[in-house]
């Protein structure tokens, strides 16, 4: 996969602007990251099951643009960071009652969608392999020279409209 406009539009925040990564086939994503990334359901419930707790949302930056709401986030279970992401949410494709919940920033989008019962599908568009020495945010534990893995994902509503486009990056897990 190449850097399309959809992906390039997500690499706008300072942490991702110069992100070095390569696209890899899902079968080449290391375990346990393959189990966490290579599926067609939401990350919130996947991370909650894997880490054994409620996933909490921390927003680093957010802004509303004419056609969407963009936010840079960290998901945590307790104090442990479990995912860093940048998400472009197309609010006009959501029912009005969900828009205010999304913009309130109290819950991850996956939790809001699952609690609402709104029909949607997760469609990963590719998997990222990121050299740990080039992406070292202070909120992730050191990678120990290993690679980090992530994915480019789209959430598609039951009406086939794009609900969100997301870059999701996972920290290294301790062996």
Regions found by a protein language model. Give the residues of each.
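Composition-driven recognition of glycine/serine/threonine/acidic- and proline-rich low-complexity segments
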Residues: 1-175
């Amino acid at each position: 996969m190449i850097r399309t406009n959809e992906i390039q539009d997500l690499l706008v925040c300072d942490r991702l602007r110069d992100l070095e990564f390569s696209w890899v086939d899902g079968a080449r994503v290391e375990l346990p990251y393959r189990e966490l990334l290579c599926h067609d359901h939401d990350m919130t419930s996947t991370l909650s099951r894997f880490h054994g707790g409620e996933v909490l949302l921390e927003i680093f930056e957010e802004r509303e643009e004419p056609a969407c709401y963009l936010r840079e986030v960290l998901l945590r279970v307790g104090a442990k960071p479990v995912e860093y992401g940048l998400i472009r949410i197309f609010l006009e494709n959501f029912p009005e009652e969900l828009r205010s919940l999304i913009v309130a920033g109290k819950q991850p989008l996956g939790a809001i969608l699952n609690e609402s019962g709104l029909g949607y599908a997760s469609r990963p568009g590719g998997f990222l392999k990121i050299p740990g020495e080039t992406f070292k945010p202070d909120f992730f534990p050191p990678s120990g020279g290993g690679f980090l893995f992530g994915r480019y994902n789209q959430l598609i509503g039951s009406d086939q409209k794009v609900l969100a486009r997301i870059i999701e990056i996972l920290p290294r897990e301790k062996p």
